[in-house]
Amino acid sequence: MNQTAILICCLIFLTLSGIQGVPLSRTVRCTCISISNQPVNPRSLEKLEIIPASQFCPRVEIIATMKKKGEKRCLNPESKAIKNLLKAVSKERSKRSP
């Protein structure tokens, strides 16, 4: 093999090995763009999701799905009102479980 062919093979190998670690999708990010500090009535909740911090999003996210219209709201986990909501929901769940 001549030197040009060897050089081309090496360049192709280096290029392909560099591509291996690149993620295919760049859409991984935090779910919540803005957060609300407003209190939420636990009776109006259909679902409450708590998403822990991860390598893709550095903050804890709390997503409340409302019964009416299925509206989703991102709640501030540091807000006193939201902390009280989490306590109320936790207390309600512990009453229901045997």
Curated annotation (Swiss-Prot):
CC annotations in GO: external side of plasma membrane; extracellular region; extracellular space
Function, in words: Pro-inflammatory cytokine that is involved in a wide variety of processes such as chemotaxis, differentiation, and activation of peripheral immune cells, regulation of cell growth, apoptosis and modulation of angiostatic effects. Plays thereby an important role during viral infections by stimulating the activation and migration of immune cells to the infected sites.
Modified residues (Citrulline): R26
Disulfide bonds: C30-C57, C32-C74
MF annotations from Gene Ontology: cAMP-dependent protein kinase regulator activity; chemoattractant activity; chemokine activity; CXCR chemokine receptor binding; CXCR3 chemokine receptor binding; heparin binding; signaling receptor binding
Chain's gene name: CXCL10
Family: Belongs to the intercrine alpha (chemokine CxC) family.
UniProt-recorded name of the protein: C-X-C motif chemokine 10
InterPro entries: Chemokine_b/g/d, Chemokine_CXC, Chemokine_CXC_CS, Chemokine_IL8-like_dom, CXC_Chemokine_domain, Interleukin_8-like_sf
Tissues and organs where the protein is expressed, per its UniProt entry: Mainly secreted by monocytes, endothelial cells as well as fibroblasts. Expressed by epithelial cells in thymus. Microglial cells produce CXCL10 in response to viral stimulation.
PROSITE patterns cross-referenced by the UniProt entry: SMALL_CYTOKINES_CXC
Protein's UniProt keywords contain Signal: yes
Mod. after translation: Several proteases can mediate post-secretion cleavages. DPP4 cleaves CXCL10 on its N-terminal 2 amino acids leading to an antagonist form of CXCL10. This dominant negative form is capable of binding CXCR3 but does not induce signaling. MMP9 cleaves 9 amino acids instead.
Matching PANTHER family: C-X-C MOTIF CHEMOKINE 10 (PTHR12015:SF188), SMALL INDUCIBLE CYTOKINE A (PTHR12015)
Pfam families cross-referenced by the UniProt entry: IL8
SUPFAM superfamilies named among the record's database cross-references: Interleukin 8-like chemokines (SSF54117)
Signal sequence region: 1-21
